[in-house]
Amino acid sequence: MSSRTGGRQAMSELKLRRLLEHNARLKDDLARPRVRVSEASASLIRYCKTTKDHLVPSVWGPVGKSEDPYGQTSGGKCCSVQ
């Protein structure tokens, strides 16, 4: 009979520990700083409008060879394996 009681107590302690860990995670989530969706979307739109993307020339216009970070280097001494 005492082994049953010990097993139940161990299960109860395990459940308590899990609940305490879950409670701690929930408290951490609650303490995390939040940003409103409207602020986040406005920030994303502002970033997209001000950051030039060289891979979308239809929006930003053609990119000069000297400005293109994805263009081929003029050194010509390196080989390219594809």
Swiss-Prot record:
What are the disulphide bonds in this sequence? none
From the UniProt entry, list the residue stretches annotated as the region Disordered.
Answer: 61-82
Q: Which UniProt keywords apply?
A: Lipoprotein, Membrane, Methylation, Palmitate, Prenylation, Transducer
Q: Name one GO biological process term.
A: G protein-coupled receptor signaling pathway
Point out residues bearing the modification Cysteine methyl ester: 79
- Fetch the InterPro entries from UniProt: G-protein_gamma-like_dom (IPR015898), GGL_sf (IPR036284), Ste18_fungal (IPR041848)
Q: Which GO terms describe its molecular function?
A: G-protein beta-subunit binding
Top-rank taxon, per record:
Eukaryota
Which residue numbers fall in the propeptide? 80-82
A GO CC annotation recorded here is: heterotrimeric G-protein complex
Q: Where in the cell is it found?
A: Membrane
Q: How does it sit in the membrane?
A: Peripheral membrane protein
Record keywords: Membrane included? yes
Stored SMART domains:
G_gamma
Q: Where is the lipid attached (S-palmitoyl cysteine)?
A: 78
Give the lipid-moiety residues, type S-farnesyl cysteine.
79
Q: Which PANTHER family match?
A: GUANINE NUCLEOTIDE-BINDING PROTEIN SUBUNIT GAMMA
Assembly with partners or alone:
G proteins are composed of 3 units, alpha, beta and gamma.
Please report which protein family the annotation says this sequence is part of: Belongs to the G protein gamma family.
> What protein name does the entry list?
Guanine nucleotide-binding protein subunit gamma
